[in-house]
Amino acid sequence: MNIIRGKIPSAQKVVIYGPEGIGKTSFAACFPDPLFIDTEGGTKHIDVARLPAPTSWTMLLEQVQEVKKENTSVCKTLVLDTADWAEQLCIKHICDKYKKSGIEDFGYGKGYIYLKEEFGRLLNLLELSLIHI
């Protein structure tokens, strides 16, 4: 019988949900060695390390890949602030790719399937890391 004792190293994945101004960003700033990908500009008045605000979905994915490549040498916690603004970048990317003016223009729910698949790429990138998210 193979018994394993002790902690198994793994990163914590946390989602913080709440209305604007409740302190989600301030709370995340207290996490171990945080690095923010600030999609909405919520860290302007907080002394934190941040990457340039992504202007496209591709830029956001590239930032995550770079942090992942550096692993824990660049930060211990990667904070995506916020997921709903990241989703808007994703929607714009999908609409541009398929030459649609909006996510509803694909027909019965198809745009949301593309959104789920594309956003899943980001979640997979985040999952394969030893950095807290």
Q: Which residues are covered by each model-predicted region?
A:
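Conserved small/polar residues in nucleotide/adenosyl-binding loops
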Residues: 131-133
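Conserved P-loop
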Residues: 2-80, 84-89
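A solvent-exposed, charged loop/short amphipathic helix patch at secondary-structure junctions
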Residues: 88-115
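Amphipathic alpha-helical transducer elements in NTP-driven molecular machines
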Residues: 54-61, 109-124
